[in-house]
């Protein structure tokens, strides 16, 4: 089942990349740096997710949404306000919630959620429980991280869109998510034009 899912994701990613490359080649057929080019970028993402049971997939989707929210916040509020100040434009400060702290919870090195997860994947005897214990030990004081009291595999994150509870069951296996050597050889040997 994991091999099937990994293969599906790799094929989807390759097909998606091929589609974007082909569209861009049609929009800008001349490889010329003399003028502005026409390109298209496609963002394929789910919206913010909060289900009764949330796992690694929802964590990744919600992290991507946190990044999009920060991009919006940075452009609309932070950048515009700096420009107004630089140009001495009279304006009224608009209060906004900055989600950088939540992004830091995910991205900080070495004690961000993803960094801890990557380190734990490399540990031969790591389990979902040892991962959860490391999250609690290293992230427990972060205001955006809330360890569950009664269930050791669960924690919550205070996102910009609300608090979401996650279950670490399967985090390690899903993060490994690599194609086996046999599947890679099968794809490479297929000779199909859509396969890398």
Enumerate the predicted regions with their spans.
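Long, cytosolic, alpha-helical-rich C-terminal regions that act as interaction/scaffolding modules
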Residues: 41, 50-196
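Flexible, glycine/threonine-enriched loop-and-boundary segments that flank and lead into catalytic domains
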Residues: 2-6, 10, 14-39, 116, ...
């Amino acid at each position: 089942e994991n091999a099937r899912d990994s293969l599906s994701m790799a094929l989807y990613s390759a097909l998606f990349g091929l589609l974007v490359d082909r569209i861009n080649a049609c929009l800008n057929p001349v490889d010329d740096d003399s003028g502005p080019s026409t390109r298209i970028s496609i963002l394929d993402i789910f919206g913010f997710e909060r289900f009764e049971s949330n796992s690694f997939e929802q964590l990744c989707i919600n992290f991507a949404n946190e990044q999009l929210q920060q991009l919006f916040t940075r452009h609309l509020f932070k950048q515009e306000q700096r420009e107004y100040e630089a140009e001495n434009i009279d304006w009224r400060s608009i209060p906004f919630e900055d989600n950088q702290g939540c992004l830091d919870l995910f991205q900080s090195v070495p004690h961000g959620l993803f960094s801890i997860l990557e380190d734990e994947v490399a540990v031969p005897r790591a389990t979902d429980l040892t991962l959860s214990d490391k999250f609690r030990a290293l992230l427990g004081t972060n205001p955006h991280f809330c360890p569950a009291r009664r269930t050791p595999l669960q924690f919550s994150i205070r996102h910009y869109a609300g608090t979401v509870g996650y279950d670490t069951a399967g985090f390690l296996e899903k993060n490994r998510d690599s194609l086996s050597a046999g599947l890679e050889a099968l794809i490479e040997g297929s000779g199909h034009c859509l396969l890398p």
